[in-house]
Regions:
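Short helix-initiation/N-cap motifs at beta->coil->alpha
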Residues: 1-5, 24, 97-104, 180-196
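Conserved N-terminal structural module of periplasmic/extracytoplasmic solute-binding proteins
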Residues: 1-33, 43-50, 64, 185, ...
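Hinge/lid segment of periplasmic solute-binding proteins
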Residues: 23-75, 227, 295-296
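Short, solvent-exposed loop/beta-turn-alpha elements that line the ligand-binding surface or hinge
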Residues: 39-52, 95, 114-123, 142-164, ...
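Extracytoplasmic/periplasmic solute-binding protein
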Residues: 63-71, 76, 101-154, 160, ...
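Extracytoplasmic/periplasmic substrate-recognition and gating elements
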Residues: 88, 170-178, 215-281, 337, ...
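Glycine-centered hinge/linker elements that transmit conformational signals in sensory
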Residues: 105-106, 150-183, 229
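Long, aromatic- and glycine/proline-rich binding clefts that accommodate carbohydrate-like moieties
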Residues: 227, 276-330, 334
Length: 361
């Protein structure tokens, strides 16, 4: 809804002075000339882009132009239930853990706790959302698109990606580590409820989970830690960063005032308040460090460590990403639900994406 209304407003005669811009909307808005280049104005209003995390700033850059300032972000990480690990005498995972470590922990946590013959506590959960399984593909050395973002063949159907798809889908189809959630549309809520009720040991998530988890911890219902996504042995750690920022319409008549507002919204008490509420990490590097240092639970420090190995989603670069994402979601459904071999399914989807990206380039 917001996306549609934003595009309509930007094309109208009375656009907003400033607008929120998620990473997936950057190609659609910026590459079509809908956002003002802030670079010529930042010096005039006393803003130094170097204050912001440069990986995040790059999302809004096109050549020498800068078409937005990042407000906040999250890497995708793994949350773990400390109580379940303690009961099983399992050490808490560390940032250098591997897929083998993850499987070992998840298997030890998958149990029939009441002796009725049915599993009622699971090691992890299979989340069908691309936003959460993409970093697992990266951490296995694979990818869904090739480096230029213009084709999938040779990458989505590569050996590393196929093995990562098979491994991730296997949580649900063969390893028995994940509960069966019959309605995929309810998966995010069902997974969160299982974790909150102490029946799930490991959960793939982002900073958006912190407000609710913080409340559960404060009430004494949970003890939670966060750790980086594990990587396949021999592969460098990796995760995805989801970023949002503020931009100015290209046709705004109040350019200087609008740029000042963008700077204030991204580097101010308001941004710190969002971070302290657990909604995201602030994009200003010093502010993110300050939030982590003040967090007595150590959660934000874990997110910052994970972010050091992160990179923005393909959505920040590929204009047709939503169509690409739909086909990738179908790919995972074919692997998990209809049990199509991952190699075959990936090959078919790679060719579909090549045609899609060629048509929309």
């Amino acid at each position: 809804m917001y996306r549609r209304e934003l595009l309509t407003a930007l094309a109208g005669d009375d656009p907003p002075d400033v607008f929120l811009l998620d990473d997936e909307d950057v190609p659609r808005v910026v590459d079509r000339g809908g956002a003002l280049d802030l670079a010529p104005y930042l010096g005039r209003v006393g803003v130094d882009p170097a204050r912001y995390d440069q990986t995040l700033v790059a999302v809004f850059r096109r050549g020498a132009g800068l078409y937005g300032l990042p407000r906040g972000y999250t890497p995708v990480v793994v949350a773990y239930n400390k109580d379940l690990l303690d009961r099983a005498a399992i050490p808490y995972p560390t940032d250098d853990w591997t897929w083998d470590d993850f499987l070992r922990v998840a298997k030890q946590l998958t149990r029939d706790t009441d002796g009725d013959g049915s599993i009622d506590q699971w090691g992890s959960a299979f989340d069908p959302r691309l936003a959460l399984w993409l970093p697992w593909i990266w951490s296995g050395g694979g990818d869904v698109l090739c480096a230029d973002g213009r084709r999938a063949s040779g990458c989505l159907d590569s050996r590393a990606t196929i093995e990562a798809l098979r491994w991730y889908a296997g949580w649900s189809t063969s390893a028995g580590l994940a509960p069966r959630i019959h309605d995929a549309r309810d998966a995010p809520g069902a997974i969160a409820r299982l974790f909150a009720s102490g029946r799930l040991g490991l959960m793939t998530t982002g900073h958006w989970a912190i407000p609710r988890l913080r409340a559960s911890v404060a009430a004494g219902r949970l003890r939670v830690g966060f750790v980086a996504i594990p990587h396949r042995a021999g592969v460098a750690p990796a995760t995805v960063l989801y970023v949002s920022g503020y931009a100015v319409p290209a046709l705004t008549p109040r350019r200087k005032a609008a740029v000042e507002l963008v700077a204030d919204l991204t580097d101010s008490a308001a941004a710190m308040a969002r971070a302290e509420a657990g909604m995201e990490l602030p994009a200003v590097a010093a502010a993110a460090r300050a939030v982590a240092e003040a967090d007595t639970l150590g959660w934000d420090a874990a997110f910052l460590r994970a972010a050091a190995h992160g990179r923005p989603s393909w959505g920040a670069r590929v204009g047709a990403w939503r169509d690409v994402a739909d086909r990738l979601a179908d790919l995972m459904d074919r692997i998990v639900i209809t049990r199509v071999d991952p190699a075959r399914a990936a090959g078919v989807t790679a060719r579909e994406l090549d045609r899609l990206l060629g048509a929309t380039r």
